């Protein structure tokens, strides 16, 4: 798993603990200039032999470059079967078994999987205690922090040439076949854990994008919008509007826009008690959903084989077309040669006819 972090001391330890318990073998983390204790937490996992830490104090929020670099380390140094491209506030949740089980069940023909995210809302009031015990109200349908459709996250089999796009939402430079959206994985997302944490994140990320003078306007547009709210003095109002108090909770539950979700809290409490956590499915039919998803994957694989057969047939037709084109070009050249010869012949006959007519005229007129 890759992690790009900056000042995430309130969550990064829980993130690494959780994913290691779920079957992740190794963590490659880039610490982008942290000064809040994040570096010390990461170094402890490095000393334990389950992580590699890269310190990067470079300017700009060049997420794609830094994550792609970690992916190459995972491919060449760790010989990883799969790489989860993760952020500190994201927890990959398997609906059945653990993460190792889910990734091991994906047929070899698929090289990447896109996973939906589910946002958890902040609590109104205090911020005492672990975030996973406080943030238990999940949106039934999530959008990002400025109201746009929440983009999925991507995990993939490492291969040469892969570039992880900004935000870890997609891949570039590869034709890895993607697993269709299934119901075996989701990402639990905790972007707003306190107002202080949220404000710090908005400022450091937004200013990081400002330092990227070659940045496309579409890259980081949501973070830049939040930075503008901060500079206009409206970020606190925005945060409070999303925080869940008793009234908002009651309305959200009645309208089915909010769900009480204690899965991560239960998992982490069990983990800290020394017991082996057991993943609780999101619904009693999770195993049936897994079978249904795997059936869909098999159907896609069959379709892929049919497409390959059609491509082979198309290549045969293309070869026939190429041969016919060559014959047509050859015939065209022959026609052009014949046309030129005919033109020369006609010109020659015209010259001979003109000469013969002149001689007759001279004889008739007595001229030579």
Model-predicted segments: where are they?
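Active-site beta-to-alpha loop of glycosyltransferases that engages the nucleotide-sugar donor
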Residues: 3-17, 33
């Amino acid at each position: 798993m890759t992690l790009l972090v900056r000042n995430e001391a309130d969550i990064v330890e829980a993130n690494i603990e959780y994913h290691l318990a779920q079957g992740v073998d190794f963590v490659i983390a880039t610490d982008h200039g942290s000064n809040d204790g994040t570096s010390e937490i990461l170094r402890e996992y490095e000393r334990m032999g389950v992580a590699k830490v890269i310190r990067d104090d470079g300017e700009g929020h060049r997420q794609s470059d830094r994550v792609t670099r970690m992916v190459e380390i995972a491919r060449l140094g760790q010989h990883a079967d799969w790489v989860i491209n993760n952020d500190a506030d994201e927890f990959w949740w398997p609906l059945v078994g653990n993460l190792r089980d889910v990734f091991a069940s994906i047929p070899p023909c698929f090289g990447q999987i896109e996973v939906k995210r589910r946002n958890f809302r902040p609590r109104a009031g205090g911020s005492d205690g672990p975030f996973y015990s406080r943030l238990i109200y999940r949106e039934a349908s999530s959008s990002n922090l400025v109201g746009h459709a929440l983009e999925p996250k991507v995990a993939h089999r490492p291969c040469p040439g892969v570039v992880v796009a900004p935000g870890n939402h997609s891949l570039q430079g590869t034709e890895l076949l993607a697993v269709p959206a299934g119901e075996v994985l989701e990402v639990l997302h905790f972007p707003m854990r306190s107002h202080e944490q949220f404000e710090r994140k908005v400022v450091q990320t937004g200013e990081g994008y400002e330092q990227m003078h070659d940045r496309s306007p579409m890259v980081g547009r949501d973070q830049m919008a939040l930075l503008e709210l901060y500079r206009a003095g409206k970020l606190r109002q925005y945060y409070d509007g999303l925080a869940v108090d008793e009234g908002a909770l009651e309305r959200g539950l009645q309208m089915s826009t909010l769900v009480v979700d204690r899965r991560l809290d239960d998992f982490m409490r069990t983990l800290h008690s020394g017991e082996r956590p057991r993943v609780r499915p999101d619904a009693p039919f999770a195993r049936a959903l897994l079978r249904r998803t795997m059936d869909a994957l098999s159907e896609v694989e069959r379709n892929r084989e049919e497409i390959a057969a059609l491509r082979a047939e198309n290549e045969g037709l293309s070869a026939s077309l190429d041969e016919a084109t060559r014959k047509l070009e050859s015939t065209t050249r022959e026609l052009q040669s014949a046309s030129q010869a005919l033109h020369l012949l006609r010109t020659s006959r015209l010259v001979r006819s003109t000469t013969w007519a002149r001689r007759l005229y001279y004889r008739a007129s007595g001229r030579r």
